[in-house]
Amino acid sequence: MAADILAGGPSEAAGLPSLLDNLRRPRADIAGLALDRPRTMGIVNVTPDSFADGGRYHARDAAIAHALQLEAEGADILDIGGESTRPGADPVDAEEEWRRVGPVIEALAPRTRARLSIDTRKAEVMRRAAQAGVHLINDVSALRHDPASLETAARTGLPVVLMHAQGDPRSMQDKPHYDDVVLDICDWLGSRIEACEAAGIPRSRLIVDPGIGFGKTLAHNLGLLGCLSLFHGLGCAVLIGASRKSFIGRLTGTADADDRLPGSLAAALIGAAQGVQVLRVHDVAATRQALAVWEGAWRAQASP
């Protein structure tokens, strides 16, 4: 649909009114958060092998302390994950994943005012996390990995992040190919939105994520960053997660993920300038400071 509309294809006449309606429609609050400004989602990896901080917060108490620190820095959402989905990562079963994240969620739910998000591909983990008090589901497979996830996510009543990934973590960087990376991913996400709506999840509860770094080359990632505004045509809130990712290292010659903060801030501001509503980041305080300067300049320009 997106490709037809932008190329003037056969479905243009039928698709253009829908696209314009999606662009104009106000976005619903997400888990009680108004989307009138960019929201920060702080990353809490309760894993031994995540690409940027694997092992640092694997222990329960360390993960809880890290989450509370991110909240103190201004995180609106805390995204808690127990399975690394970095390129080449091995999967873990649902029981092990819950063993990692369950105690952290249960400890944070009564202690934090930030919204809690569960970063998982598994229906059982979604179900248990919802019962434990999370406010949001973030699935890097867009509810495709687990056949039960569509129904489970619908039953929770929670908002869901649908992320694009080509392949699975073990194979996604094996020569990824697209005819047009932006239009292909926009159409793919559109099909996932339709699947969710058919399962009883309304569009107002969906957030789309083009999946920077997941089955993409450097050129693909840069192309997506330059065209993020197109994804608003899907009628959902938009999230990006570019923080510390390897494309920044390839572009700048920065091998250590900890040294990629400047590039991460640049990516966040590129997203904010194109109306992205949620920024998934490791460095909440620095991102909030960068956004404050950007927002201040934007408001000053808009003032009479």
Where are the model-predicted features located?
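Active-site-adjacent loop and "lid" segments of alpha/beta metabolic enzymes
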Residues: 6, 19-25, 35, 52-66, ...
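Conserved hydrophobic/aromatic pocket- or pore-lining residues that grip, position, or stack substrates
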Residues: 44, 74, 137
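Short coil/turn linkers that connect adjacent helices within long alpha-helical scaffolds
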Residues: 199-201
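Glycine/alanine-rich phosphate-binding loops at beta-alpha junctions
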Residues: 23-30, 59-61, 71, 78-79
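Glycine-/small-residue-enriched capping loops at alpha/beta junctions
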Residues: 1-31, 46
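Catalytic domains of carbohydrate-active enzymes, especially glycoside hydrolases
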Residues: 65-81, 274-275
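Short, hydrophobic/glycine-enriched beta-strand segments
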Residues: 39-45
